[in-house]
Amino acid sequence: MKDLLKFLKQQSKTEEFNGIKIGLASPDLIRSWSFGEVKKPETINYRTFKPEREGLFCARIFGPVKDYECLCGKYKRLKHRGVICEKCGVEVTQTKVRRERMGHIELASPVAHIWFLKSLPSRIGLMLDMTLRDIERVLYFESFVVIEPGMTSLERGQMLTEENYLDALEEYGDEFEAKMGAEAVLELLRAIDLEKEIEQMREELPSINSETRRKKVTKRLKLMEAFHTSGNKPEWMILKVLPVLPPDLRPLVPLDGGRFATSDLNDLYRRVINRNNRLKRLLDLAAPDIIVRNEKRMLQESVDALLDNGRRGRAITGSNKRPLKSLADMIKGKQGRFRQNLLGKRVDYSGRSVITVGPTLRLHQCGLPKKMALELFKPFIYGKLEGRGLATTIKAAKKMVEREVAEVWDVLDEVIREHPVMLNRAPTLHRLGIQAFEPVLIEGKAIQLHPLVCAAYNADFDGDQMAVHVPLTLEAQLEARALMMSTNNILSPANGEPVITPSQDVVLGLYYTSRERINGRGEGMYFMSVAEVEKAYATGAAELHARVKVRITETVIGDNGERTEQRRIVDTTVGRALLSQILPAGLSFDLVNQNMGKKQISKLLNTCYRQLGLKDTVIFADQLMYTGFRYATISGASVGIDDMVIPAEKYTLVADAEAEVLEIQEQFQSGLVTAGERYNKVIDIWASANEKVSKAMMENLSTETVINRDGVEEKQASFNSIYMMADSGARGSAAQIRQLAGMRGLMAKPDGSIIETPIVANFREGLNVLQYFISTHGARKGLADTALKTANSGYLTRRLVDVAQDLVVIEDDCGTHEGLTMKPLIEGGDVVEPLRERVLGRVVAVDVMYPGTEDVLAPRNTLLDEAWCDKLEEHSIDEVIVRSVITCDTDFGVCAACYGRDLARGHLINHGEAIGVVAAQSIGEPGTQLTMRTFHIGGAASRASAENNVQVKNSGSLKLHNAKYVTNTDGKLVIVSRSSELAIIDELGREKERYKVPYGTVLEKLEEASVEAGDIIANWDPHTHPIITEVAGSIKFVDMIDGVTMTRQTDELTGLSSIVILDVGQRGSAGKEMRPMIRLVGADGSDLMIPGTEVPAQYFLPGSAIVNLDDNAQIAVGDALARIPQESSKTRDITGGLPRVADLFEARKPKEPAILAEISGTISFGKETKGKRRLVITPADGGEHYEEMIPKWRNLNVFEGEKVERGEVIADGPEAAHDILRLRGIHNVANYIVNEVQDVYRLQGVKINDKHIEVIIRQMLRKCVITSAGDSEFLEGEQVEVSRVKIANRELVEQGKVPATFERELLGITKASLATESFISAASFQETTRVLTEAAVGGKSDNLRGLKENVIVGRLIPAGTGYAYHKTRNDARAKKDEPVVVNKITASEAEQNLADLLNLAGSQD
């Protein structure tokens, strides 16, 4: 019966588990793990190489050294298994138990665990409410602590130095007890009554007023509750028993020459054992106190070093001055257990080799060298050889393969057929870095790669290497074929556009084919079909570029899928007609009837995919490639030095610029301009000269004039090779051609400033030594930048993946009605991103109506595809509310409707799709293309003259957004609100452009008026800020006393006098409290009110305001009472590129953030303190007013008496994301981060869908702070996952209790990763020690929800195909958890049940 049970136990070894709990180990638990106590520091006998008894490698404790053989050799072989040898005490079993059997050391004196002592905040310190400094002094025997005060005046936990202790002893005798060392701390911890303490603290919390004290108590309360609920005991933070790691995990390996290589842990354990034994001896001898104390301190230090070397004091070093690697070092960092062995493993059945081009391959194939294939597919070959009876045993098969017999190759062909392999190129930045192909056997040793997948791999053939992996199991092969095949990865997951677009040679070939040339041989011929064109081309009757007329046949596919043929005659060229042969049926000929540049080809493939689906697109892409290569070869496009045509005008342009520079130089020498102005002017002159030269050059290159058949001059695009390469998008750009044939232009110094003498030469003319030297700066900086960039970009990707890794689609629809409002992105009047691109592939959250009616155009929950977007554009909708992951209500994960279309597949996203990782990869992958630098606004850019008007680009009608205005005497509108915007609407009601206009803008047109393109419709003075009156009347000066609060200045030229208000700092003591203002009064002298309010019309004047009016003057509505000079804001460095993206995702506060209004209300200024102004906002409803101190030098946008809305900008600057979230809500912060990140990527021409950024933002917003706890378990001010609060609140509401209220919090990605619910994921990211300490104290359990945790414990991930597996498991578990009725059974029944169980277990295996 016992054997049966043992067998059962072995059966259920791979028990399914659903979580991992971490906690503190009690001394008894450690003893229960142990197989014996390690008493001696010896390791192995250096003569016999046998482990020493009771030593660190003892066979009796840890198990036999050889399989099924005891140490003395009495029992050998399998038949004795389980016997314990009576001579040497070793159990006869497998030697692998030495990897799992632990030992222990009984410590002679307790020792504090350094993690709970030193990991901040110190858990032991928090528990005892003592400072870390004090506890350390007790532990390391520097002072005493009172444990039992007895009847004395001492307090428990009071520190006593040696002298104080002796004094107390004299005074009180043995009334009290005080100790030092870990024993003292142990007793203090043991004496804590958790329940009582918790109750006490919960009671005193509400009455605490001081913020710091409250925080401290809350922290302590949380710790105590964690201990209480998890069942950990505080005294377990002090070790009495030390576990010993199994010996095979800290091996001792003999090297040749009689030396040993050993794990550092053995040294560390040896020190502990030595000191422990010495301490035991000293205690037995009753040695003097001071010696024992010293030994105890040394023991404490050696245990510290074993657990975490270097955490306290100097690290213990080995013989070679290198710090020893402790247990903590084993798990943390890039080389630690987590990142080296659990998250990244080496893989068998893999090989790597150099890659080369396979231009004849199909898209789903790769060329695999025979040698590699033979090695990789060995087991399959052996199996086949045996199955065919060609070899009798595996050994024979092995021999055959080694000899490379002819049959082996036949078998290999068969094995490889339909067996995909995976190709990977490092660095794998996104999921397209590993794709599956069908291998084609080739001679040679290099892997052949299909040219079209190079873009996805970012591969080129200059020596890149790639790795091959073989999917072994049937499931793996199936997944490789169905999901990872290169033909299934045509669209990029980052933006949904084709990623297999042709580039370089292919583009050049197709472009060359589709160009037209005037007077080409065969021009003007008529052809009845494309076949006839082909004959004419083949016989040489017509050349490739001749303009001809051809009758073509097109297949049109209707909405219901029926195909109809249409014939028409088109004007085209021979080349384009030939291209139409490979065009799949159902695509219009117009798609190829144009110059086929890279953009056009990409669009062609995209159209093909959307209209005809995957299969046709793949075949078409291959055909395009073959055609492109063929015609690129035929074209013979090559670059010769004469192709770089230098424009004749260059020399005159350069001479003109030099003359201008001389003129400026003279002005500078005669003192008319400053050095800075001169420098800026010179740079401007050269920059514009360069522009002119390059313009002349491009005009010269791009067209040539020919005489056509009718004898008339006609311009045609040039066939210059360099121009064709740039124009088609195959290689090079206008900027590069400019350096070849124009002039190199201005160069930068290493510090980023521009050198004012440009390089006038170009590469064709050649550079002289100085010019070459100047050029080297930029080149070197570029290389240094690239190296830094790669590391930074990789780290950003890692943080992004870590924060988003557990986000998976888990349901169809969460049912939320919330969403984000999408409008076209308009900047400075231009539409940067039309609405179509922003909503394509998203789901509608709120019905979209036909404009101006109540009819629904697109109902809620519609997935907007291309056809729907066409419809929206047709009805000129310019605002759609779409579902977003940020507003998704699913608890753990998101729903498909909130995510929308799977960009790489083009349909609604599937369950189990790991959208978090995809988002992180999409944002991180282009990271290396972003720049690293911060831009200094200087030179040409900074003097972009301040804008002072709006000139419209499109005709339409004028519309104002959140603007208040008054009409002045000229009948023009004057804006009197901030953050107003002015938009131009076309006749369909679509917004074409939008501009921000400041306070005091004068509009030339009324609202709704029609404007023509090019009209100037708004003017303002950029250098002063007016104060506009909203009522007419006569003015009264209040508190404006000459010489006290103001001075009069007279302009010498005009003789006009004006009043200047003095700044508070410049006034005498009399004027400090005065508030100069202008009051408006009616004819009878009574106060006038601002229209629509009870507020008297009075305008406060800030310091340095200029008033051009006299007291009692009459004014009209819309007049300026005063002007405040604006200092141009200091030139700030604009952080760009990668650092900017990192700052946004880390939610870092900018240096001088914009100050936003915390509440809505009226502005006033209170009493000033030195260097600061006191800003007061009084709400209209008479609630609590809000005060804020603002430094004097900040440029405020608001004036006394103005009304502001909550979240409005008070002082300019970069806005902080946290402020936006707090004051304007979640939608605004999402929009802000998305737009800011997109700006950086757009600048580099990288397209990323907004969805991906939103996914990361959702993860940044997943925590919240409890504002009031209601009836919940949460503490006020506690940081909790939003989903947990929502679940708890739902339960509370169901029970009719008060739910908790919370405020969302924005965390940077690093913080958010570390704050995740899963401690395994957080520990494997960063700060391993801190995370594990916290988790252990709280007794946290990890439910293994995310991908990372599951990879670490070695399971399928709960995403993709693993999602189904986990789902079925969870469903089964839910079923199993239903309560079961238990009946008592007899012993015989139990035996019968056991037998059944065994049969069942056997059948399941």
UniProtKB/Swiss-Prot annotation:
Give disulfide pairs as residue numbers. none
List the SMART domains.
Answer: RPOLA_N (SM00663)
User: Which UniProt keywords are given for this protein, alphabetically ordered?
Assistant: DNA-directed RNA polymerase, Magnesium, Metal-binding, Nucleotidyltransferase, Transcription, Transferase, Zinc
Q: Which GO terms describe its molecular function?
A: DNA binding; DNA-directed RNA polymerase activity; magnesium ion binding; zinc ion binding
According to its record, what are the GO cellular component terms? DNA-directed RNA polymerase complex
> Which reaction(s) are listed as its catalytic activity?
RNA(n) + a ribonucleoside 5'-triphosphate = RNA(n+1) + diphosphate
InterPro entries recorded: DNA-dir_RpoC_beta_prime, DNA-dir_RpoC_beta_prime_bact, RNA_pol_asu, RNA_pol_N, RNA_pol_Rpb1_1, RNA_pol_Rpb1_3, RNA_pol_Rpb1_3_sf, RNA_pol_Rpb1_4
The UniProt record gives the binding positions of Mg(2+) as 460, 462, 464
Q: Could you tell me which CDD domains the record lists for this protein? A: RNAP_beta'_C, RNAP_beta'_N
Report residues binding Zn(2+) 2.
814, 888, 895, 898
Q: Which residues bind Zn(2+) 1?
A: 70, 72, 85, 88
Q: Where are the transmembrane segments?
A: none
Name the Enzyme Commission number(s) assigned to this protein: 2.7.7.6
Q: Which cofactor does it need?
A: Mg(2+); Zn(2+)
Q: A single GO BP annotation from the record?
A: DNA-templated transcription
Q: How is the cofactor bound?
A: Binds 1 Mg(2+) ion per subunit.
Protein family membership: Belongs to the RNA polymerase beta' chain family.
The protein's job, in short, is: DNA-dependent RNA polymerase catalyzes the transcription of DNA into RNA using the four ribonucleoside triphosphates as substrates.
Under NCBIfam families, the record lists:
rpoC_TIGR
Q: How does it assemble?
A: The RNAP catalytic core consists of 2 alpha, 1 beta, 1 beta' and 1 omega subunit. When a sigma factor is associated with the core the holoenzyme is formed, which can initiate transcription.
Quote the protein name from its UniProt record.
Answer: DNA-directed RNA polymerase subunit beta'
- Species the sequence originates in: Shewanella sp. (strain MR-4)
